[in-house]
Amino acid sequence: MSTSAPINRRLTKKIYVGDVAIGGDAPISVQSMTNTDTCDVAATVAQIERCVEAGADLMRVSTPTMDTVKAFGEIRKLVSVPLIADVHFDHKIALAVAAAGADCLRINPGNIGSDAKVREVVACAKHYNIPIRIGVNAGSLEKDIQRKYKEPNGAAMLESAMRHIDILERLNFDQYKVSVKASNVFLTMDAYRLISAQIDNPLHLGVTEAGVYRTGSVKSAIALGGLLLDGIGDTIRISLAAEPEEEIKIGFDILKSLNIRSNGVNFIACPSCSRQEFDVIRVMTALESRLEDIREPMNLSVIGCKVNGPGEAKEADIGIVGAAPKSLVYRMGEKSHLIDTDNLVDEIEGMVRAHAEELAKKRENEIIRVR
């Protein structure tokens, strides 16, 4: 059960990265980027698999050398998730990694080289039927744009993006998505609002170099949350100085909080006070860890006393109202039964897993009926 204000999402052109649709009516996808040595195939594959387990729809892999291109080809064979190759400066790497199986190329047409080299890359992308992401960052704008605007701002980032877009459009290539990232929340939001008014291709949202886990998550939630509420954005990446699977989790937490896309358990819990009938923080910390693998969407409310407990529990799929020695369980808004307060973690985990199985079976039956 949930309530939400409608979000009027901006209608964009739909493109495909592998089998994942980006833009149009497709769900907003969540992606991350590996931080291993790409040449360490085993470590990179293991990291990608951890991200996929966390829910990643797409993964980006850096390919700065021809050795990494060779490794990319091996990685491509070992994972099922679509892979985006991150390429800078050397157009030959872009050509080689496309041939090695890249599902998308992340480039800046402005730093790949001459028009002839850009034409080669675009022809290659057309040949392999893969899209290109134009990635503009506030920290690496072209020198003439820096001189013109003196400092990074939304207009400067828009001009850089439109310059790169014009290169692709002149080559009759429209299978692209765009990002205009900055490490500053306000600059990021301004740039995306400006570009969204100019183009109808998909937008990849992110705050670049957002920082360490806590502060980076906050910056990303503010910037991306505000843009998503405005209906802007088709795929997101949370850039953190942390393990990439944590980026995936935060990305889905943002989408869940906006009722845009649910993936796993949405935890609702009180901050706890002297009224609590059990250790709320201990219970919730344990549950968050134990239930990380759940993918079926549901709301779980755990409140430590009867002041706000019943109201929150009625709005959740599973709700707990704390009391001693027994706590009251609500199921789908209705009172259900009592459970031992001393054994809350095990009891709640069991109920959540059972509900997840019910939801999975229901979803499978709906798929069968459609077929």
Curated annotation (Swiss-Prot):
The keyword Metal-binding applies. Pathway: Isoprenoid biosynthesis; isopentenyl diphosphate biosynthesis via DXP pathway; isopentenyl diphosphate from 1-deoxy-D-xylulose 5-phosphate: step 5/6. GO terms for biological process: isopentenyl diphosphate biosynthetic process, methylerythritol 4-phosphate pathway; terpenoid biosynthetic process. It is an enzyme of class 1 (oxidoreductase). The keyword Zinc does not apply. [4Fe-4S] cluster binds at C270, C273, C305, E312. It catalyses: (2E)-4-hydroxy-3-methylbut-2-enyl diphosphate + oxidized [flavodoxin] + H2O + 2 H(+) = 2-C-methyl-D-erythritol 2,4-cyclic diphosphate + reduced [flavodoxin]. Gene3D superfamilies: Dihydropteroate synthase-like, Sulfite Reductase Hemoprotein, domain 1. Its EC number is 1.17.7.3. One of its GO terms (molecular function) is 4-hydroxy-3-methylbut-2-enyl-diphosphate synthase activity (flavodoxin). Keywords: 4Fe-4S, Iron, Iron-sulfur, Isoprene biosynthesis, Metal-binding, Oxidoreductase. Its cofactor is [4Fe-4S] cluster. Binds 1 [4Fe-4S] cluster. Converts 2C-methyl-D-erythritol 2,4-cyclodiphosphate (ME-2,4cPP) into 1-hydroxy-2-methyl-2-(E)-butenyl 4-diphosphate. Belongs to the IspG family. HAMAP family: IspG. This is 4-hydroxy-3-methylbut-2-en-1-yl diphosphate synthase (flavodoxin). It comes from Psychrobacter arcticus (strain DSM 17307 / VKM B-2377 / 273-4).
